[in-house]
A protein has these predicted regions:
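Extracellular/periplasmic solute-recognition and catalytic clefts
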Residues: 161, 165, 179, 238-249, ...
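Ligand-site clamp/hinge motif
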Residues: 135, 223-226, 256-308, 443-460
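Aromatic- and charge-enriched surface segment that lines or borders ligand/interaction sites
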Residues: 119-164, 188-190, 284-287, 342-344
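Alpha-helical secondary-structure segments
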Residues: 70, 147-154, 184-190, 234, ...
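Surface-exposed binding/hinge segments that line
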Residues: 64, 168-217, 223-225, 234-241
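Detector for C-terminal structural segments
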Residues: 18-25, 52-53, 241-248, 332, ...
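Gly/Pro-rich hinge or "lid" segments in bacterial periplasmic/extracellular proteins
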Residues: 88, 94-101, 105-112, 203-267, ...
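N-terminal lobe/hinge region of extracytoplasmic solute-binding protein
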Residues: 36-57, 66-125, 156, 230
């Protein structure tokens, strides 16, 4: 018995002793100005600890655990890596962004801080340092404990040139002032400067699983390309769960740490989430109506209105829901590659703005359900300039701008030419989603202005790679927006636009979020000032100036804004009262829904037998509506 006990004890100790990377340890020693080690006795005595317990719980205690959520994806992600080339893809939200936590979270209705991996926190008297007590029960999805060392490792990892991700190198270098370990479950994080929302910024720090990165080194991209990085969330992907171009399966962690915590219990309820590759949206929609998919977004009008004629809806099995949220609006529109010939001319870009009739797309294709986006940074409250308006479609103004760029002659096909005989013609790239169906509208409207848009539709992953390599002319795109402060360094700073060669030449910088390639010293200087600002009035002033400069540069053609989301779901998918929370981008953002598998079996049997379940049902939930 003693031998068995000793063995079990040794196993427990071995599991607790997570791998320590000697390179990381050396890095901490070489950067003593940033990495600090102390004892609990060194904690300031005047700290006022908070735990965020006064906020209202938002998940539904009626939620049931279990079942398989059946979803679709147009393609599998090009990589399972969290960072590095091709990692910032459309599937990242399911794998990581919605499946991981920092020290703190924001309450999705009030925006107030609530605990996440930290159970309590305190701010220093000067407002520059936040202290956090970590949840000793929290673990990564691979079962490894989350300790102070994983937060230290995050800085080593994200600053490493091996990840080939300059945004992270910059962010984890200049947006943090230092980190201190008092013990395994107590840390302090220092800010680089005073700034609004200091606690929220410092509370965003997320740990990196150092045990998983035993092989971290120069071959990072290849070594970890098809390996799921453990997160602090409730789901993980096994080796068998990633079948390239076939499916991705997320499996729920048994006894996840969040199941025992206020704000996290009653959430993320399915045991399994299966994403099957269905390339065509029409095919996915038919799978929904057949009960092979549990719910799906139906933002496109032909699905939203067309569902009214479908048997699954008419017989009361499928419910339509329109949920209005209150979040910063993703900038849907056309991104002009200013590093390409002719497109580096601002007059050409202004002409493109007037030659692109998004209002016609909104009124026709979207039946007026969407609204015109006016600029790149909308929905940021006082940080958004409400006076900036999108340039209106006007053949006269478009031709006037093109004339300033030297395009004054009209060819026999109606397309403008310059004196060198160059035609005013650009490749317009869309993905193969339903949006491609309004390409003809944009092409026809442009032709009226003497402009040729040459339409190109690519499978999602192929398009993503093309745009990130800066091989496009003009592409329809949108970036997700996290937080309520403008973050323009990655999308508009010259640092992310070009690489400067030894001979002085500039070439487009690949794999950055500056997909317009805009390299404007004045705008870059404003962005630098904003990032260094410490007082809110100055930050607001700079924010408005940045937005005006982006508007003047005309590298982005605002498309439309979507004031929420629309889905259709079967009756075995249950939602809480109010349906979702203010900050939700879609039902999986906060994971408040649950499944009743027994109802699925009965509903499908009755549906196929022609049994009418009830009257058609449409829910409009607009308590958070802002527009």
């Amino acid at each position: 018995m003693r031998t068995l006990c000793a063995f079990l004890f040794a196993m427990a100790v071995a599991q607790a002793e997570t791998f320590q990377d000697p390179n990381a340890t050396k890095y901490y020693t070489e950067h003593k100005e940033f990495f600090h080690f102390a004892t609990p006795a060194d904690l300031p005595k005047d700290l006022t600890w908070q735990d965020g317990s006064g906020q209202k719980e938002f998940a539904d205690p009626r939620a049931l655990r279990g079942g398989i959520l059946r979803q679709f994806t147009p393609s599998t992600p090009p990589t399972l890596r969290r960072v590095g080339p091709n990692a910032n893809n459309g599937f990242r939200g399911e794998l990581y962004d919605n499946n991981d936590f920092g020290l703190l979270s924001s309450h999705p209705n009030s925006d107030e801080p609530i605990p996440a991996l930290a159970t309590s926190w305190a701010m220093s008297a000067d407002g520059m340092t936040a202290y956090f007590k970590l949840d000793p029960h929290a673990k990564f999805t691979d079962g490894q404990p989350i300790t102070a060392d994983d937060y230290f490792f995050a800085f080593y990892f994200y600053r490493s040139p091996w990840i080939n991700a300059e945004w992270y190198v910059d962010y984890y270098t200049r947006e943090w002032g230092g980190i201190t370990k008092f013990d395994n479950y107590t840390i302090a994080v220092k800010a680089p400067r005073k700034r609004p929302m200091q606690l929220e910024n410092l509370g965003e720090l997320r740990p990196i699983p150092r045990n998983f990165f035993k092989d971290f080194g120069p071959t990072y991209e290849k070594t970890y390309n098809d390996r799921f990085q453990p997160t602090t969330g409730p789901y993980y992907v096994t080796k068998e769960g990633f079948q390239r171009e076939k499916s991705v399966t997320l499996t729920r962690v048994k006894d996840w740490w969040g199941d025992h915590r206020k704000y996290y219990r009653y959430r993320y309820n399915p045991d399994t989430i299966e994403f099957t590759v269905i390339r065509e949206i029409d095919s996915a929609y038919e799978s929904l109506l057949a009960g092979e998919i549990d719910f799906m977004p139906i933002r496109m009008p032909r699905y939203w209105y067309g569902t009214n004629e479908k048997k699954a809806y008419l017989d009361g099995y499928v419910t339509k829901v329109q949920f209005f949220n209150d979040i910063p609006r993703p900038p849907y529109g056309l991104y002009i590659n200013t590093q390409r010939p002719l497109l580096n001319d601002r007059n050409i870009r202004i002409g493109l703005q007037h030659a692109t009739d998004f209002q016609r797309v909104i009124e026709g294709f979207y039946r007026g359900d969407y609204e015109r986006l006016n600029q790149f940074s909308e929905g940021l409250g006082k940080y958004t300039d409400p006076t900036i308006r999108a340039r209106l479609f006007s053949p006269e103004l478009a031709r006037a701008a093109f004339a300033k760029a030297g395009f004054t002659q009209t060819g026999p096909d109606g397309i403008l030419k310059n004196t060198a005989g160059e035609r005013l013609s650009f490749r317009l790239t869309f993905d193969t989603s339903d949006r491609r169906k309004y390409l003809a509208t944009l092409v026809e409207s442009a032709h009226r202005c003497g402009l040729e848009y040459r339409p190109e539709t690519l499978e999602h992953t192929t398009m993503y790679r093309k745009v990130m390599e800066k091989n496009h002319d003009i592409a329809f795109w949108a970036w997700s927006v996290s937080g309520r402060l403008p973050a323009l360094w990655e999308s508009h700073h010259g640092d992310n636009a070009v690489d400067k060669l030894a001979d002085g030449r500039k070439v487009p910088k690949r794999q950055t979020n500056n997909i317009t390639g805009i390299d404007d010293p004045e705008l870059s200087a404003l962005i630098d000032k904003f990032r260094a600002a410490t007082e809110e009035p100055e930050m607001i002033k700079l924010s408005l100036q940045m937005q005006r400069r982006i508007h003047d540069n005309a590298d982005f053609i605002p498309g439309f804004r979507v004031p929420g989301y629309r889905i259709a779901h079967w009756g075995w998918v249950k939602f809480p009262e109010g349906f979702d929370v203010r900050s939700a981008e879609d039902p999986q953002s906060y994971g408040l829904f649950w499944l009743v598998p027994s109802e699925r079996d009965k509903d499908l049997k009755d549906f196929r037998a022609g049994v009418v379940r009830g009257p058609p049902k449409t829910i409009i939930e607009d308590r958070w509506r802002t527009e």
